[in-house]
Amino acid sequence: MQVSVETTQGLGRRVTITVPAADVEKAVSSELVNVAKKVRIDGFRKGKVPMNVVKQRYGASVIQDVLSDLMQRNFINAIIEQKINPAGAPSYAPEQFKNGEDFTYSVEFEVYPEIELKDLESIEVEKPVVEVKDEDVDAMLETLRKQQANWKETEEAVGAEDRVTVDFNGSVDGEEFEGGKASDFVLAMGQGRMIPGFEEGIVGHKAGEEFTIDVNFPEDYHAENLKGKAAKFAITLKKVEQRELPEFNEEFIKRFGIADGTVDGLRAEVRKNMERELKNAVRNRIKSQVIDGLVKVNEIDVPAAIVDSEIDVLRRQSAQRFGGNEKQALELPRELFEEQAKRRVVVGLLLGEVISSNELKADEERVKALIEEMASAYEAPQEVIEFYGKNQELMNNVRNVALEEQAVEVLLGKAKVSEKETTFNELMNQNQMA
């Protein structure tokens, strides 16, 4: 077998393989013998069909099967011999086969990039220094009250935290636009759901009023035809509602599973949950900075085939979130996911190299701790722990998380780390925007 390897472009490779005629003939003859033992042809006993009849009836299909098998087996042998690491499915291109002659074919594919990590010491990380303070707990308790509030209609003017029901009709340069019109639209103020200026234009008005507000669509607005455009919205304010906060009493406290119904019990539970969230937020903030730095100082090419596979994964995940099916998932434009998919492939390859070059193995104590941490958010933690222990796929997922954390710690040990004091709210908001 003769093998030659050439680079087509970037990570593209073409392997050309020539199989000696004798090897092809031997494989075809062997397969014809196997076929002759199995086939039934009228006028002949099973296993007694003359070889010339078998060749006449089955020769062409046997040759096709043999060539297909030879191409795959010899390609695998060739990449092992040449120490090539292919990425994605190969594409076979056989030349025309002629009896008694050598058989030549080529295979095109991509390879994984050769990665040599560099400049790890230049990665900069700001480690958040933060704790859950009493005022953070107070604010969270007030948020819980707002979440449990009832809404009561009022004749007063709209306030910054009220809820309104409106009809609106938007126009740009006097022309209505898609998605710019709604009836009986319920809007909780202060949540930033609408474009800048929309909510502010409603504040101060009363139910029954009709008015127009002027706004500007942001330059980064998702609809291309509206980016940066000035718009007018005709508003009919149909209803204004204010929150009626529940009393901070035993009945309210017991809604959150606090058996003794005490303020101290609720504060302790809220603090525990906030500290768990904070721990995750700090960990995620550090991890995102480490990975951003790793990607910045280690630019690599990635195989298009692997990016395509990742795009398909993201398409399916997106379709599932919005109740779509497989067909609808594949119809989603690849442009929506291409940048994210490429980023995920780059990060995966770079972290894989960190893991490989440092010979990291998942720390089972860390795996156990991660499962216990996740389980602590449930009412029956032990049941969750046991469920994970019986599910090998879930256990492997947690091991991958642990291994990724270990890789991040290795990188963190080489990075320039500084500390920055922050608050609970600042850090949580940063993580939401990331």
UniProtKB/Swiss-Prot annotation:
Catalyzed reactions per annotation: [protein]-peptidylproline (omega=180) = [protein]-peptidylproline (omega=0)
Originating species: Photorhabdus laumondii subsp. laumondii (strain DSM 15139 / CIP 105565 / TT01) (Photorhabdus luminescens subsp. laumondii)
Main location: cytoplasm
A Pfam entry, by short name: Trigger_N
Protein name: Trigger factor
Disulfide bond entries: none
Gene3D superfamilies: 3.10.50.40, Trigger factor ribosome-binding domain, Trigger factor, C-terminal domain
Record's keyword terms, sorted: Cell cycle, Cell division, Chaperone, Cytoplasm, Isomerase, Rotamase
Family membership noted in the UniProt record: Belongs to the FKBP-type PPIase family. Tig subfamily.
